[in-house]
Amino acid sequence: MTRDQNGTWEMESNDNFEGYMKALDIDFATRKIAVALTQTKIIEQDGDKFKTKTNSTFRNYDLDFTVGVEFDEYTKGLDNRNVKTLIIWEGDALVCVQKGEKENRGWKQWVEGDKLYLELTCGDQVCRQVFKKK
């Protein structure tokens, strides 16, 4: 594994995305559209500073952060909630905790070879996504 997550990453698989969205109380119609989409992630990393874009034909989401610095995040276009977000390194993986009205919410992201792995968690639901470097 490596801490270098720079690059453009195209989605290969998206396991249990609907279960994850249900745990976030995302409506039925939005879930049905979202599970059919393929996402592209663009990550610009300078040490512990990240600029990320998650793009699809339905919605885009930008997130800029510095590892180890808690910040207020509004999950616009996702579940539209305000959360306190902290992202840290655990080994070569980024681990995010999002504190708010949903319990056990966050994600873990790491790179192995030419693959980016992302596990999204909310409550007892885990979505596993795999992206390939473009």
UniProtKB/Swiss-Prot annotation:
- Offer a single GO CC term for the protein: cytosol
Q: Name one GO molecular function term.
A: retinal binding
CDD domains hit by this protein: CRBP2
Instruction: Name where it mostly resides.
Output: cytoplasm
GO terms in the biological process aspect are: fatty acid transport
Where found in the cell?
Cytoplasm
Give the binding site residues for all-trans-retinol: K41, Q109
Source species, domain of life: Eukaryota
Please give one Pfam family short name: Lipocalin
Q: Which UniProt keywords apply?
A: Cytoplasm, Retinol-binding, Transport, Vitamin A
Query: What protein family is recorded?
Result: Belongs to the calycin superfamily. Fatty-acid binding protein (FABP) family.
Functionally, this protein is described as follows: Intracellular transport of retinol.
**What's said on domains?**
Forms a beta-barrel structure that accommodates hydrophobic ligands in its interior.
Q: What is this protein called?
A: Retinol-binding protein 2
